[in-house]
């Protein structure tokens, strides 16, 4: 009788351990998760670092922006196709775009095709962010990116993730 109870308890504990292990594997298995915990701890800004080759580009996750933006200076550094269009932009002051840079950036080995509006007035805004926080921001990632790649921002866990 006691042996049967011990076996049942051991079996229940083993099943619980396996379930927890599987949950951890599933959580870690989301290779499309983007953490902005480090930047929030450092500067209280949701910033994610993308790469293009060996170059690093820090992008502020901006849920208030429909589109993703870079400055003219950053457009010179990023490899991509510039599509010449002009459009009025509202938000961080008034400005116009001098085109769209269609490029590919990577995060943790995953490539993302992204259209970045080249926005005239962002240089001063990025300089101000750097002066106040010490973080060099190269661009803004807007809602179009989150929708295209099906990202959800979780500000409790400080991650952007895709639902599988």
What is each stretch, according to the model?
Residues 1-164:
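Pepsin/retropepsin-fold aspartyl endopeptidases
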């Amino acid at each position: 009788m006691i042996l049967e109870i011990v076996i049942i308890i051991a079996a229940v504990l083993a099943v619980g351990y396996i379930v927890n292990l599987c949950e951890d594997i599933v959580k870690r298995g989301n290779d499309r998760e983007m953490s902005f915990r480090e930047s929030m701890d450092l500067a209280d800004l949701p910033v994610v670092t993308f790469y293009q080759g060996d170059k690093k580009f820090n992008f502020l996750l901006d849920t208030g922006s429909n589109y993703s933006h870079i400055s003219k200076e950053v457009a010179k550094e990023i490899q991509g196709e510039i599509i010449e269009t002009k459009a009025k932009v509202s938000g961080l002051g008034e400005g116009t775009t001098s085109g769209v840079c269609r490029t590919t950036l990577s995060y943790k080995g995953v490539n993302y095709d992204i259209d970045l509006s080249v926005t005239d007035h962002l240089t001063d805004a990025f300089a101000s962010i750097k002066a106040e926080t010490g973080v060099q921001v190269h661009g803004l990632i807007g809602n179009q990116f989150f929708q295209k790649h099906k990202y959800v921002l979780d500000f409790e866990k400080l991650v952007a993730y895709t639902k599988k």
